[in-house]
Amino acid sequence: MLNRNLNEEFETFKRNAADKSISCEIVAGHVVQSVMTGEDGHKLCFLLGTILEDYLMIRKKPDQVLFGPVDFRLNESNIFQPDLAVVEQSEVYRNGVIRASGAEQIPKFIVEVLSDGNEIYDCLDKAVMYGKSGVKEYWLIDLKEEFIYTYSYRNGFDYRRYSFEQNIRSRCYPGFECCISDILWEDGGSLRELALFYRFKKEVYPESAVQLV
């Protein structure tokens, strides 16, 4: 369990930060605050999650896509809030919390949007922590520069950078690849509209969104 004082501090920060669009995480026993993922980031993560759900359904995989904010409790000193996580259904998930108490209960795949002012933390510190905890793959989206940084921890460490125009191939889920520019909808819309738009687009142009090989 979390140290009582640290847990109370964390919950207090979360309550106060929610009204200010600030997210809270615990890193090495310290509360870290950052600007919450904005609307564009939420929409992109939602679309990626929708594509992943389709991939998992087609491949009949039992994994489950969770949309953030969701607490990922690595241990008593580290709690993260990924924007998107894929976990196995056997994992302990309740009350908006992924409780990691063993290797089989660690998210296999995590997606986050880069936070302003937290570049080193997101790109280095968190990437290392995820790898050590047993996460198989971590995608970090940079909306400003339009790049995606991928970190794979299967069979050694693999780091790559992709533009939004390039196909990104997952190493955690063989056969899954996507191109961000092909799934974005520049005119905006609600999350439900985006999901309907994506599924319609996939039926009309099945090669443009998700590819299974």
Roles of regions detected by a PLM:
Residues 1-213:
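Gly/Pro/Ser/Thr-rich low-complexity, intrinsically disordered segments predominantly at protein N-termini
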